């Protein structure tokens, strides 16, 4: 993976599948050995990681949708953590 920055376009990592789980009332990340239950913030970020949107674009969408400002550093930190867990990948 290349270095992470605001223009990085993350996508769900190979071997993982993101889906909404009505029973859990949250997004979950499924993989062969189990499941990761995401909190609302993590689910909202992961749902936008389609390999087309940049980290900055994702932060902008979330700021608009939730009437918030300054989410860029938090989104970047989540993407970095998710990349270390291999939940997300980028070129």
Which residue ranges define each predicted feature?
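Long, charge-rich, low-complexity alpha-helical segments
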Residues: 34-91
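Acidic, low-complexity/disordered tracts enriched in E/D and polar residues
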Residues: 1-47, 91
């Amino acid at each position: 993976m290349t270095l992470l920055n605001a223009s990085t376009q993350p996508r769900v990592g190979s071997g993982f599948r993101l889906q909404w789980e009505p029973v859990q009332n949250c997004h979950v990340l499924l993989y062969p050995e189990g499941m990761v239950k995401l909190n609302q913030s993590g689910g909202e970020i992961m749902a936008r990681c389609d390999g087309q949107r940049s980290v900055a674009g994702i932060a902008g969408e979330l700021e608009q949708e939730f009437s918030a400002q300054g989410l860029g550093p938090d989104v970047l930190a989540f993407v970095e953590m998710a990349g270390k867990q291999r939940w997300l990948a980028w070129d």
